[in-house]
Amino acid sequence: MSNSESDGAAARAKESRRFFEKQLAGEQPLSFETAGQLFRLGMQLLAVQPWEFLEDQDLFLMQDGESGEICYCSTMGALGEVFSLQVYTGAESYRFFRRIAAGKPTSAGDFYSSMRGVSVEFVTAREQTPPDRELLEAFGHLKKRGKRAPIFRALRPGYHPWYVTEGEAKILVYCLQGILAFCRHAAEMGDIDYWEKEDVFPFLVPKAEDKTHEHFEIRLVKAPEPPVAAPRAEELDESLISGILPEYLPKRGALEADHFFTGAKIGEQNERKACLRIAMVSDGDSGVAFQPELGKPEDSTGQLLARALLGAMRDGRFVPSEVRVRHKEFKILLSGLSEKIGFGVRVTKSLPALDHLKDHFLAMVGDPGEISDW
């Protein structure tokens, strides 16, 4: 084989290489070409260090060309602790970002249950996993004590950050191109405050004649907090209800019910780690805990609450006169069940019996607590 043939074979072998294949079984792994783009753009952003002149809450917006969704992009690093570009996609993620930026109490479970997007974080070798190091070494990164390098992650509601698929990586490539163009523009224009007006942000639009995505037009757009989507009552699982109705159980007392995600991880070594999700019910008078209902990230909140309540009624041998919940959303989700069985649902700020159980459970599973405590 000639040298040119050998070089060509080596190049083809590289091009066919994939990253994160074991960790993304059943999904499209990261291609060599896209991984190379991520690495080069990530290293460029690390050199620019945008956190030196951008605050964590200085969002810029872009539109995903495939889905049409808005990407809300934020650089982190002004505090000198975490250095990253975070890209939040969709209205729910944006709404939750604003909640964090406003300093409202936010648990780890709340964060992971709501956020969807992609990120590049710049970490030292101690924080890099073997799959991360495999990618970095493939593009010539030399490991050095204390030296930071980019790692690439995706956030999906109900899951911990995990390795990016090919599709998720392309969104991140696009947003990296956008912030690098924005940084070049900011360096040329000097001290311009794009965020001086409330709810107004720079929106980056690729110039039509530029196929490289290196040049963007900057438009200022108003992006107020989107309204919360109205919940709808869940369809009833008649097979579960039939186990309650014919028994003519006595009606008495109150039950306290809640649903939440925790920061505890569930999953095998090379699996995307789900957050432990649970619906809990306790007797509002005695504080007795009933069997909790565990759920997957994709499960319906209303169904989890309904199953937990029906299980409590079966085990407790009574139908409550009242069910107390913390959120108006839960009252709506349970409206069909409450009408069918005949109990009231009341929204209250405090669930003393259940909160005691919840705090004990979170401590037992090692939940990290509120984001401000991390």
Tell where the protein language model's regions lie, with residue ranges.
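Secondary-structure boundary/capping micro-motif
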Residues: 2-279, 284-374
